[in-house]
Amino acid sequence: MDLDLLARIKRHEVLAAIRAGERIDGRDFEEFRPIEVRAGVISKANGSALVRLGNTQLVVGVKLEVGRPYPDSPNEGALAVNAELVPLADPSFEPGPPDENAIELSRVVDRGIRESEMIDLEELCIEEGEHCWVTFVDIHVLDHDGNLFDASMIGSVSALSITEVPKAEVVDDEVEVMEEDTEPLAINDFPISVTIAKVGEYLLVDPCLEEEVIMDTRLTVTVTESGEVCAVQKGELGDFPEHLLEDAIDLATKKAEEVRRTVKAQL
């Protein structure tokens, strides 16, 4: 059978289910897929987590390296988030340098961590203006079945929350790192993102891949532990009317607390 015809049939099935008040996988419109988190899965990383969100699966590793502070923040450490989307995870992903999807994914996670002030960057300064810890958060997608944003945020904050920082001291202008002598990374918050797909006038929490293919637009809302919205990212070309935007943000704020409880219970 023609692949385009198969795609049209599947699109019709997904849309028909939504219009009937259902979803293709049987969930309610406001329901997340099952969330599984396993922390500490990479022995050589300073922190790590494996996340399953339905059939979406990814692993996040945190690695700390000694670097130089930025000139405009000489008393702070640095944060760098990277995402790797490989063909093994989804045929639509291409090998090579990060594409626009990987870059957007990295930026959404980075912004959520920064704007929530999850990490106390000042605690990562070793010597003001000279040496600091650079925190690398690397996201590796293993299986893509939709909503990489929320899965990546869950994995990143989970990995950071168990990260251990080696003690370091400066001797004769050189940084000596004591790998076996560590302390927990200073954490101030536990941000959670909630992604909502808009299909017509319908709002779907945690869209699976089949729903992402037909959605008009997407909103990813990152929420702090206190319930404050700290970051919002809109995706795709469709519009988001004001009344639906308000509904989406309210819904995201409510769901973020549920997801946070689920994740923390597994750490």
UniProtKB/Swiss-Prot annotation:
Protein keywords: Cytoplasm, Exosome
Entry GO CC: cytoplasmic exosome (RNase complex)
SUPFAM superfamilies: Ribonuclease PH domain 2-like, Ribosomal protein S5 domain 2-like
Main location: cytoplasm
Location in the cell: Cytoplasm
GO molecular function: mRNA 3'-UTR AU-rich region binding
Pfam families membership: RNase_PH (PF01138), RNase_PH_C (PF03725)
Top-rank lineage group of the source organism: Archaea
Family under the similarity heading: Belongs to the RNase PH family. Rrp42 subfamily.
NCBIfam families, alphabetized: PRK04282.1-1
Assembly and binders: Component of the archaeal exosome complex. Forms a hexameric ring-like arrangement composed of 3 Rrp41-Rrp42 heterodimers. The hexameric ring associates with a trimer of Rrp4 and/or Csl4 subunits.
Protein name: Exosome complex component Rrp42
Gene from which this protein is expressed: rrp42
